[in-house]
């Protein structure tokens, strides 16, 4: 059930993700199998079980996929337990990410794979969300009150998927004027400001150090072209070719 790529076409078309009735009918069984492989990433069974409920809610037909409607919709769901899962549960994030990368390598890994770095914005109405600010929102093409995330994706002739993400926190959030908001959002004490290219560079260095995903190419837009941090990370690596967009000005 992987995307089909038409590599003979120019320009390269967006690959299609083909699904039929059998994929839909057996989806929950496949989701359970997927969920099971992350059991050892949790020290307690309760948060691991709530992960499945959260995933089930995200894949449901609910119009609003916030915690309360999802908890009330899925089997065994409890609103307070689901809220604690999101706000307080502890899991081994690094282990989960490596397991995810192992799955990707097995399903679509290729020596000619491509690592792609870019950011995307999510419009927000209020100011309670971590890192929310009036800033450029690429998803709508203008400045808006939003959160912005930096994303890493993997693509090959066998398919494509996201492989990492991190929330970008604007510099003003680290000023004294935002101290209460940082505390409310439970920012770690050691968290410091990083530019989007710095975040992407750290993602790239970790992916390369883990040696799980095979790749030959690195691609990013002009935001990363102008960053010495990102260029230093991707340049002069034997066997790796990078493609970075050049701004018109």
Describe the predicted segments one by one:
Residues 2-3, 8-14, 20-84:
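Gly/serine-rich nucleotide phosphate-binding loop at the start of the catalytic core
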Residues 30-44, 52, 61, 77, ...:
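Phosphate-ester processing/binding pockets and catalytic centers
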Residues 86-171, 178, 182:
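Active-site-proximal, Lys/Arg-enriched surface segment
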Residues 55-56, 88, 218-223:
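Conserved short loop/turn motifs at secondary-structure junctions
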Residues 180-249:
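An internal, acidic/charged active-site-proximal segment
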Residues 61, 73, 107-110, 210, ...:
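Alpha-helix C-cap/termination motif
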Residues 62, 96, 144, 222-226:
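Short, glycine/acidic-rich beta->alpha junctions
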């Amino acid at each position: 059930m992987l995307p089909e790529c038409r590599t003979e076409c120019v320009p390269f078309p967006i690959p299609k993700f083909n699904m039929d009735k059998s994929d839909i009918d057996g989806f929950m069984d496949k989701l359970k199998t997927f969920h099971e492989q992350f059991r050892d990433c949790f020290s307690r069974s309760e948060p691991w079980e709530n992960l499945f409920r959260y995933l089930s809610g995200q894949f449901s037909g609910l119009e609003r996929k916030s915690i309360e409607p999802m908890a009330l919709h899925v089997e065994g769901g409890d609103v307070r337990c689901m809220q604690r899962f999101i706000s307080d549960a502890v899991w081994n994030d690094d282990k989960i990410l490596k397991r995810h990368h192992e799955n990707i390598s097995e399903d679509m890994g290729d020596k000619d794979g491509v690592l792609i770095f870019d950011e995307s914005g999510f419009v927000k109405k209020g100011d309670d969300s971590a890192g929310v600010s009036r800033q450029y929102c690429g998803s709508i093409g203008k400045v808006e009150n939003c959160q912005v995330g930096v994303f890493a994706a993997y693509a090959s002739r066998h398919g494509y998927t996201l492989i990492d993400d991190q929330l970008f926190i604007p510099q003003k959030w680290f000023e004294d004027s935002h101290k209460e908001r940082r505390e409310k959002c439970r920012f770690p004490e050691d968290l410091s400001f990083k530019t989007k290219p710095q975040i992407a560079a750290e993602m790239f260095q970790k992916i390369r150090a883990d040696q799980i995903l095979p790749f030959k190419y690195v691609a990013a837009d002009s935001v990363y072209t102008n960053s010495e941090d990102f260029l230093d990370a991707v340049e002069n690596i034997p066997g790796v070719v990078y493609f970075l967009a050049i701004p018109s000005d």
